[in-house]
Every structure is written in structure tokens, then in C-alpha cells.
Amino acid sequence: VALAAPTTVLVRQHLETFRSRFEEAGIVVAGLSRLSSPAERKAVIAGLKDGSVQVVIGTGAVAGKTVAYKDLGLVIVDEEQRFGAADKAKLRTMGAKHVLTLSATPIPRTLQQALVGLQQLSIIATPPARRQPIRTTVTAFDEQLVRTALLRERARRGQSFVVVPRIEDMAGMADKLRALVPELQIRQAHGKMPASEIDEAMVAFAGGEGDVLLATNIIEAGLDVPRANTMIVWKADLFGLSQLHQLRGRV
């Protein structure tokens, strides 16, 4: 089985989940991305070739030229809309018997193929058990409302997201948040940070470090933060509809 995810953060999260769930079953799960050291990469590629690694999770690297599979039965493409056409073509032609693509906001071409019967389509319309519906409020920016929302989430031992449309908005919003809620720990993540720093910030936040994650829409790609139940989107009119839909999925 090969699972491809668009970001290294998502790869790391999938790795932790798969390893915890398949640990007792004796299934070997390995990772393959730009964060893998040369030695790790070499060992994983060798394991895939001889069959000792049964599941590999990575970015587009799982379809690399040097990667060969002993008996590839299933390719899973998570957040399919985040991959380019060339990347998806490579993933689909890896020789797997089955290909499963996952998306909360499918691109028109994929949706069209499913509707005309070229691809089988399954819709997951039932939320997980005990999952509460998302309440969405549209209002003008109100400092007191922001403070109340963030402190309320902290009081229930939860975490919050604050999302801005542009990297240029980060510094100003960070200053506002520090003035509004000086008692909260604020972490930041945006696309111009080094990849290792983005990974560290987002994985640490998902692990419970920090009260607020101030970020651009970089967080839309499937990051699972169980304790995060509040999101404030500043200047929501500058986001696309699919982006807002993906962002809502983070809480």
C-alpha cells in the first residue's frame, strides 16, 4: 500500500496514526519524504522492493523513479485536489490494482469522471460519533469578541486557529493578538518559513503546544488537531469557497 499526501506535516500525522493502529498487527509502516535522511530513504526503498515494508506513506516521493514495489495493491491519494495533473498521473500509473482518491473539495475533472461513471464514487456524509456540527458566524472584526472566543476555548482546555489571507497580514495580526490575549501562547505558520520550521510549528501545535496558531491557509491540508475547536478567519472574503470549506474542516 502506498499513501501519498501533499505536505510533510500530513505525512507525519498519517505515519503516527497508521503505526499506532497497525503496530499489533505486525504490519511495517514506513515514511518517505524530503525529511527522510539518505539512510532512511535507502532502507525504505529496499524494504518496498523486497516486500518487508507493507505500507509506505509519503509525498510525491512514493512515485519516484528509484522506488519499486514488490506487489503494490493499493495507492491512496489524500487531499487529491492539492496534487498537480502530472503528479496524479504518476501515482495512477504505479502499477497498483486499485487507486483510492480522497478529497473534501474534488476538482471539477474528478467530479465529472465520477458522475459519468468513469470512476466509482463514495460519499462520506455521516460525521464521526459525538461530532458536533460546526457553528459558523459572519461578523465584523470585533476585538472583544475575539478575546472572548479565544479565552473561552482556553478555559475548556482547547486550542484555536486564527487565519489570515496573506503573509503580509501576519505581523499586524500577531501584534493585535498579543495585545488582546497576552496570557495565551501564540504560534505561527506560513509558506515563507523553512519547511522544517513549518513542520515543527504545526506538529507541536497538533501535539498540544500553544493556545493559538496564527497561520495563512497553509493549514487547510487536512491537519488533525483534536483539541482545536475555534477558528477565526480574518477577511474571509479574500478566500475562495473551497478554501473556506477546507478550513472549516480543521475544527
PLM features: what roles do these ranges have?
Residues V1-V251:
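Inter-lobe coupling/hinge segments of SF2-like helicase ATPases
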